[in-house]
Amino acid sequence: MTRLPLKLLLLMLSAMVALPGNAGDELAGYWQHESDPVWIDIQPETGQGVMVRNDNRPDRIGFLIVTDLETSDDHNAWSAQVFAARLGEYRKAEITLSADDRMVFTVKVGFMRRSVEWRRVSEVPPAPNDA
């Protein structure tokens, strides 16, 4: 192998690692809320997280919970706009992976901070009404 193709190969590999679409792959997939019957689908390629099931509010299916998802310098952290249900609006949030199967949204409002944990699931189970 000559030097030029090796340099080209290294450049291509570096570019692939730096692509935004690959940056959030660790977040991609289905997540269940820590205490509520709510499931979301995190889609790093679109920078969004969509509600795919909500047993208490089925009318919210399809609602964007996460928008503007972006990587940060930390390998296990991202920033995004997250819908804060109690406030009824999107707020800037930090999203972290505390483990491979645990995701945490942290929203700060003034001096207050609230964190919500999500657990990774392989699929979204059918809703009780669908069974």
Model region roles, listed by residue range:
Residues 25-92, 123:
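Central antiparallel beta-sheet cores of small beta-barrel/beta-sandwich binding domains
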